[in-house]
C-alpha cells in the first residue's frame, strides 16, 4: 500500500481512462462505476454526500466512454475486460481494498469484479442490475424478457446509432419514459451522442455473447447490498429478489419506493446512506 495521491487518469490495455478523484484524500475509498447511457458525472450528487461522510470517491469514465479508451469492435467490451479495467484502477490507487459500487452496467462490472477479485473489495453495493445469473433466471421466469427488448435491438450493427442520431425526439421520449429528467436527457445528448461515446456504450450490450458462462454461476464472498427501485422500467422485482442467492456473505436487499431506474441522481441521499451502512458494516466485521 502506498501513500494516498490524487489521480486524474489510469492506463490499461493501451487505453487511458479519465477519473474523478474527490473527497478527503485520507478517507476510505469508494469506487463508483456508471452505466449506460451516462458517464461518471451521473455520480456527482451521491459522491458529494459520501464526501460529507468522510469517504474519498473514485469515479472513472469507463471503457467506451473516456475519449482515449474507445477500442473498436465489440469483443473488446466483454466482461473480462471490464473487470480488468476495474482491477487496474484499484491497483493504480495503491490504497488496498475498496468499497465498490456500480449502477446499471457498472453494477455488472462490480458484481463480476467482486466475484473474481474479492481480495480487492471490502464491500459491494450494486444498484438496479442484479448478479448476471439472477438476471438470466429472471429473463426466463418473469417479465424481464419483455423489459429487456432493447438489448436485442442493440445487437444490430450501426442501425441503433443511426436511429438515435437521426431521430432525437424518439430518444428523448424513450429516456423520459424511463424517468430521466430533461436535464439528464440533455446530458446524454452532450456526453454520449455528440461526445462520441454512443458506439462504445452500445458495445457493452453487443459483447454479451462473448462473456464466459462461468460468470452466471460466480459466487460473491464479500458483504453486499443490492438496491432496486420499484419505478425501474428496465429491471424486474424478480431479478432483484434472486440476486442474494449468489452471495455467500452478509447480504441485504434494499427496495426504494417511487424511484425510477436513475437512482444515483434521483435518490442520492438514500443511496449514499445505504453505501455508508454497507461499508461501515463490512469494515466492522472481523477478518
Spans of model-derived segments:
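Conserved HGGG/HGGXW glycine-rich cap/lid loop of the alpha/beta-hydrolase fold
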Residues: 20-69
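Conserved short acidic donor-positioning loop in nucleotide-sugar-dependent glycosyltransferases
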Residues: 259
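Flexible "cap/lid" subdomain of the alpha/beta-hydrolase fold that forms the substrate-access gate
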Residues: 2-6, 12-17, 29, 58, ...
Amino acid at each position: 500500500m502506498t501513500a494516498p495521491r490524487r489521480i486524474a487518469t489510469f492506463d490499461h490495455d493501451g487505453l487511458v481512462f479519465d477519473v474523478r478523484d474527490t473527497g478527503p484524500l485520507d478517507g476510505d475509498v469508494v469506487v463508483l462505476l456508471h452505466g449506460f447511457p451516462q458517464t461518471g458525472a451521473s455520480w456527482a450528487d451521491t459522491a458529494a454526500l459520501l464526501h460529507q461522510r468522510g469517504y474519498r470517491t473514485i469515479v472513472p469514465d469507463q471503457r467506451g466512454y473516456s475519449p482515449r479508451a474507445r477500442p473498436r469492435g465489440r469483443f473488446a467490451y466483454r466482461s473480462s475486460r471490464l473487470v480488468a479495467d476495474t482491477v487496474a484502477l484499484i491497483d493504480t490507487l495503491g490504497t488496498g481494498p475498496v468499497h465498490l459500487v456500480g449502477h446499471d452496467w457498472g453494477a455488472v462490472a462490480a458484481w463480476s469484479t467482486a466475484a473474481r477479485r474479492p481480495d480487492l473489495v471490502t464491500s459491494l453495493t450494486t444498484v438496479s442490475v442484479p448478479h448476471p445469473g439472477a438476471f438470466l433466471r429472471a429473463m426466463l421466469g418473469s417479465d424481464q424478457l419483455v423489459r429487456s427488448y432493447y438489448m436485442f435491438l442493440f445487437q444490430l450493427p450501426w442501425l441503433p446509432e443511426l436511429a438515435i442520431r437521426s431521430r432525437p425526439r424518439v430518444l428523448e421520449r424513450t429516456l423520459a419514459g424511463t424517468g430521466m429528467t430533461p436535464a439528464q436527457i440533455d446530458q446524454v445528448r452532450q456526453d454520449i451522442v455528440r461526445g462520441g461515446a454512443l458506439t462504445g456504450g452500445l458495445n457493452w450490450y453487443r459483447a454479451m455473447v462473448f462473456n464466459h458462462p462461468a460468470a452466471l454461476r460466480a459466487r460473491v464472498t464479500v458483504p453486499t447490498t443490492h438496491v432496486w427501485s420499484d419505478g425501474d422500467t428496465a429491471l424486474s422485482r424478480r431479478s432483484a429478489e434472486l440476486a442474494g442467492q449468489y452471495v455467500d456473505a452478509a447480504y441485504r436487499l434494499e427496495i426504494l419506493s417511487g424511484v425510477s431506474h436513475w437512482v444515483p441522481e434521483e435518490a442520492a441521499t438514500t443511496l449514499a446512506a445505504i453505501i455508508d451502512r454497507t461499508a461501515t458494516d463490512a469494515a466492522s466485521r472481523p477478518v
